[in-house]
Regions:
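Acidic, glycine/GT-rich loop-and beta-edge segments that sit at the periphery of enzyme/chaperone cores
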Residues: 1, 336, 343-358, 500-552
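Glycine-rich phosphate-binding loops at beta-strand->alpha-helix junctions
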Residues: 26, 242-250, 270, 294-296, ...
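Conserved ATP-utilizing enzyme core subdomain
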Residues: 28-30, 197-198, 202, 358-408
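Glycine-rich phosphate-binding/catalytic subdomain of phosphoryl-transfer
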Residues: 55-60, 67, 74-365, 369
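Phosphate/ATP-binding catalytic cores across multiple sugar-kinase/actin-like superfamilies
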Residues: 75-83, 273, 422-452, 499, ...
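Glycine-rich phosphate-binding/hydrolytic loop that grips phosphoryl groups
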Residues: 130, 275-279, 328-334, 338-341, ...
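Activation-segment/catalytic-loop signature of the eukaryotic protein kinase fold
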Residues: 381-479
Length: 552
């Protein structure tokens, strides 16, 4: 079971760990006690900037400052230790990570960032994608012979402009002086592992995320044929480690900055696509979870590699060596809710936050207050938002169609339409897209599923009304675990638990993460949601050319 508390006495039989959930807009750090259960003793959050478009100097750019990641990590580490004086820094057995994936962090031999890291959202490399794979006779956006080679070795294909290969090639083409300085290509958590331990490594799931990883049994590792095909210097790729492996120890310098003991073990951890499902308890074959954070996805645990190139879905390497995560992504999920806060209802939300919050509220508490506001507002509008339909493609889209030109829209606004309908339509639009991806997934994975229940997690699962809307739109049970916003950190703790042999396998995590609430679908809302869902899917098909005219 997962608990959250601050005060207490040290359990002499327990192990204490600190884990970091590094998201798109902030870090969530948790001090966790591992015993017969996993208990979150304290948590702390800190935000950092996401620089997009004009802020990067490039159309489609999405970058972050690595020093801001590290500063947030140091600040929150000290905070959780201060909240738990009965747990000293010497009692921390290890640290681990869960982070956003498919970033591009290029470092020199000293471990310094050569340029500001690009995030998974970056879509500047359109020309590199076209030259690299999107030319000639194509299937699912990839030249046929290259597609076949990809599928033979990696089980997936780099046919999205947001894939890190094309960002790497963009640096080669546009920043040759920076390219010459590259020692290693890292992802986000790998950079923080380097900063903490001095080790240049990458976990298997992150390596798969580069789409340069050979997944064939007995051949696991960097794939030389694919690297040659796309023009990647294999010497730029770091040593590959398991997610449950101790990859290094905290250095003297890092220990002083973090407030931890020198020599504390550093574990590999995993990407968010690998560990959020683990933290939600979706660890057995056939288990499905839906995540709604800044981005969002639908993931199902499967025993083999599966590819649906036409829908940009693939079974990715995770932290369990005996399973894969069949995965479809929405680029902007709860980011759409942030857009509501910042633009559509800025004044109303500001008044609400002043009334129910205060200036000292943490990054996380503001998120809680925001969902309280949304719950209060959308409850006043009937299912279907009085016919208004929203598309959550605020930064293009990846699954079940790849189109960086796709954009958000409100459809069917009339004279009587109010702001509250628009706000509810945003929440419904996110859920419609999740249903679209889930239905496409189940064309491939239905044979593995033991039940239709879906585990819902991330910040989006904080709102009871949002959870009920998802259940109604999917027309199936939706279950939520305790602290759904902290599950990435719990998944990272599971890596340490397995690495320290406190639990045998990742599948054993499920019994430690019981369901808190189950939402059952309201059959009365099925007809209106089915109607709006059909319109939702039509909106992309009917506007694809218009998106290209306006955004291409």
């Amino acid at each position: 079971m997962i608990y959250i508390y601050v005060a207490g006495k040290a359990n002499t039989m327990a192990k204490y760990v600190i884990t970091y959930d590094i998201g798109t807009t902030g870090i969530k750090t948790c001090l966790i006690e591992i015993d017969e259960s996993m208990k979150i003793l304290a948590s702390s959050t800190a935000g950092y900037n996401l620089y997009v478009d004009d802020e990067t100097g490039v159309k489609g750019g999405a970058e972050q400052d690595a020093d801001e990641w590290w500063e947030a990590m140091c600040t929150t580490t000290k905070t959780v230790l201060n909240k738990t004086p009965h747990v000293t820094k010497e009692m921390i057995e290890g640290i681990s990570f869960c982070s956003a994936m498919q970033g591009l962090v290029l470092v020199d031999k000293e471990g310094n960032c050569i340029r500001r890291p690009m995030t998974y959202m970056d879509q500047r490399a359109r020309e590199e994608l076209k030259k690299g794979i999107a030319h000639g006779v194509q299937v699912a956006g990839a030249e046929v012979t290259k597609l076949l080679k990809y599928l033979r070795y990696t089980g997936a294909v780099s046919s999205s402009v947001k894939d890190p290969i094309w960002k790497y090639k963009w640096v080669e083409a546009h920043e040759p002086e920076n390219f010459k300085k590259i020692y290693k290509w890292l992802d986000i958590k790998e950079y923080l592992i380097l900063r903490a331990s001095g080790e240049f490594v990458m976990t298997q799931d992150s390596a798969f995320g580069t789409l340069l990883y050979d997944t064939r049994k007995g051949h696991e590792g960097w794939c030389n044929p694919v690297c040659k095909m796309v023009g990647v210097n294999i010497e730029h790729m770091p040593t590959i480690k398991k997610s449950t492996e101790e990859v290094g120890k905290i250095t003297e310098k890092a220990a002083k900055e973090l407030g931890l003991a020198e020599g504390t073990a550093v574990y590999g951890g995993g990407g968010d696509a690998s560990l959020i499902g683990v933290g939600a308890g979706a660890v057995e074959i056939g288990d499905t979870h839906i995540y709604s954070g800044t981005s969002g996805w639908v993931g199902t645990v499967v025993p083999e590699q599966i590819v649906d190139a036409g829908a940009m879905m693939a079974a990715i390497v995770g932290v369990d060596p005996e399973a894969y995560n069949y995965f479809g992504e929405l680029e902007t999920s709860n980011k759409c809710v942030s857009w509501v806060k910042d633009h559509l209802a800025l004044d109303e939300i500001g008044v609400f936050l002043k009334k129910y919050g205060n200036a000292s509220d943490s990054f996380e508490q503001v998120e809680f207050n925001l969902y309280d506001y949304l719950e209060e507002v959308i409850d006043t509008i009937p299912a279907g938002s009085n016919g208004v339909v929203f598309t959550p493609w605020l930064h293009g889209n990846r699954c079940p169609f790849e189109d960086p030109n796709a954009a958000g829209m409100f459809f069917n606004i009339r004279l009587e339409t109010g702001k509250t309908e628009l706000i509810r339509a945003v929440v419904e639009g996110i859920c419609f897209h999740m249903r679209w991806m889930l239905e496409r997934q189940e064309q491939k994975v239905s044979k593995y599923k033991k039940e239709d229940t879906v585990r819902f997690c991330g910040g989006g699962a904080l709102g009871e009304t949002t959870c009920q809307i998802l259940s109604d739109i999917l027309q199936r049970d939706v279950v939520v675990v305790e602290s759904p916003q902290n599950i990435g950190a719990v998944g990272a703790a599971a890596c340490i638990a397995v690495g320290m042999k406190l639990i045998p396998t990742m599948k054993d995590v499920k019994k430690l993460i019981p369901v808190k609430t189950t939402y059952h679908p309201n059959k009365a809302n099925k007809a209106v949601y089915d109607r709006n869902f059909q319109v939702f899917k039509n909106l992309y098909k009917d506007n694809k050319k218009n998106f290209e005219i306006l955004n291409g």
